[in-house]
Amino acid sequence: MAKPTIANVAELAGVSQATVSRALRGATNVTEETRIKVQRAADQLNFTLSKSASALASGKTMRVILLVSGKLNEWFNSGVLQGVYEELAPVGYDVTPAFITDRSELDRFFSQLPKSRNADAIIISSFQLMPAMRDQLQAIDLPTVGVNVPTESGYFDASISIDNFSAMTMAVRLLRSLGHTNIAFCSDYIPADMVYNTSQRTQAFADAAQANATDGITFSLLTADAHDAPLSKSDLASQLTAKLLSLPERPTAVCVETDQVAIALVKELRKQQLNVPEDISVLGFDDAEIAQAADLSTIRQEPIELGRIAGRKVLQLLRNEPLEHPHELQDPLLVLRNTTSRIDSGAAPAE
């Protein structure tokens, strides 16, 4: 059986081929009655307007790029992708994921973008743009939405981010309420030419520590040594543990930039004959699936919901609809399990 064509749909619906094209693309200059008639004819013939034809007629690619740092199969990145897809796919947009791991890959991506212009919008997750990159996006009129990015930069048309300062304030107040007076924050090394969301988290901890500082409270920021290739989580935890134990006075509580690093840190601390949480409390960040399995106390963020909100903002920008709140913050949630406790007692109760 021959594949149905737009001419077949036009004949069955009793309209022109141009009207079929406009109706199936959702153009506004088609009556609802005609649109329904055309759609019924298309359904009867199992006809679908090709995206390439639709793009040629509308001037749109019907494609949105999701640019993330790190690997696509990581918990946070896959969650954001799922949320973006849920919002964009039902209205006909393809979501094209791309990932970068260092500055050279980021520069290469942006050097190729103006030449291809193969997307209608771009969502950038968990890292900051450089001024030259933002200029490139503006030059090709590409709407830009950020996920977990600094909202004060002005480099994004819209954004949705976890409230890092609120999260770190919760963490500091929790640990202080449990009697801890020597609290550290542990993070991986971040190159000076990149600004990731985790670096915002480090600054948020420093700000929260300053805001909650009182006599007798000590805060420490511990960062891995500079390295070119990414460290494994176990190697990173080993290095951070060595830094913790080399302090003049060992902290009794540690906040960690991600759950994965926190879990590796707990394992390394126990190898050093330190009991968690009796000797040292550990608090992660993310509440990924692995955190529940490891019974890790942590701070929850919702990457799927972040992706959904980013997807909705993209659609509003593409439709030229006003955004009531272009830049939003997602509230974090403390999840207490069994890696935090009072300094003088057993483990904190599970959630």
Segments the model singles out, each with a brief description of its role:
Residues M1-T5, M62-R173, S246-E249:
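Alpha-helical recognition/docking segments in bacterial nutrient-uptake
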Residues M1-T61, A350-E351:
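N-terminal helix-turn-helix DNA-binding module of bacterial transcription factors
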Residues T19, L56-L72, N182-P191:
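Short beta-strand segments enriched in small/hydrophobic residues
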Residues L88-I100, T202, A206-S234:
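Short beta-strand elements in bilobed, periplasmic/extracellular small-molecule ligand-binding domains
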Residues I160-C186, Q203, D207, K233-K243, ...:
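Hydrophobic alpha-helical segments within soluble ligand-binding/sensing domains
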Residues T169-N212, P326-S341:
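An alpha-beta-alpha
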Residues T181-N182, G216-T218, V276-V282:
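Short acidic capping loops at alpha-helix termini that bridge into adjacent secondary structure
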Residues S238, A242-E351:
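Flexible loop/turn connectors
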